[in-house]
Amino acid sequence: MTINLILLSLLAYVIGSIPSGLWIGKIFYKKDIREFGSGNLGATNSFRVLGIKAGSIVTVMDILKGTVATLLPFFFQLNVDHHFWLLTGAFAIIGHSFPLFAGFRGGKAVATSAGVILAYAPLLFVAALVVFLVTLKLSKYVSLSSMIGALAALIISLFMGDWILIVLVACIALFVIWRHRANITRIRNGEEPKIKWM
């Protein structure tokens, strides 16, 4: 069982490493999104550089990376406690952030982390998504909405009584905020781009 779990965790990392934005940009738009906008491989920069259609596809793909990776123990009928689903999910987040296929320079882990939560705690995902969308509607800042959504997920998880989930969501929230530190500076300086499509 231990070997199988290790293998699934490695597979989850590989799944997380799929650079959706990079590949879609290069294949369909002949653009390397690392050379435009924020230079980030995530969904937000895909929206900014490639447009709403491509950005939406990248977002869905990045969410699915987290969801599929989290459910790997279920798909392979591995007889482990469901908390181990969070382990494979965590490896997908690591893969997305430090992708094997993109020089270990990845995204900010928001969408893939959301996919992990979707697979493990769907109601928590919905609640955090609502907070994200409301914040996005009011502020027009994707970065700010992502951070507030992550913090909301942490606060809500505290009432769920699942301490392993709480620890993971706390790590996700801290990591998301850390990855957005440049965005925080730009928001303070009034230099952070706002979305125009919502």
UniProtKB/Swiss-Prot annotation:
EC annotation from Swiss-Prot or TrEMBL: 2.3.1.275
Name under which the protein is recorded: Glycerol-3-phosphate acyltransferase
Keywords associated with the record: Cell membrane, Lipid biosynthesis, Lipid metabolism, Membrane, Phospholipid biosynthesis, Phospholipid metabolism, Transferase, Transmembrane, Transmembrane helix
Name of the gene: plsY
Organism from which the protein derives: Listeria monocytogenes serovar 1/2a (strain ATCC BAA-679 / EGD-e)
Predominant localisation class: membrane
GO MF entry, a single one: acyl-phosphate glycerol-3-phosphate acyltransferase activity
Job description of the protein: Catalyzes the transfer of an acyl group from acyl-phosphate (acyl-PO(4)) to glycerol-3-phosphate (G3P) to form lysophosphatidic acid (LPA). This enzyme utilizes acyl-phosphate as fatty acyl donor, but not acyl-CoA or acyl-ACP.
Record field: transmembrane: 5-25, 56-76, 84-104, 114-134, 158-178
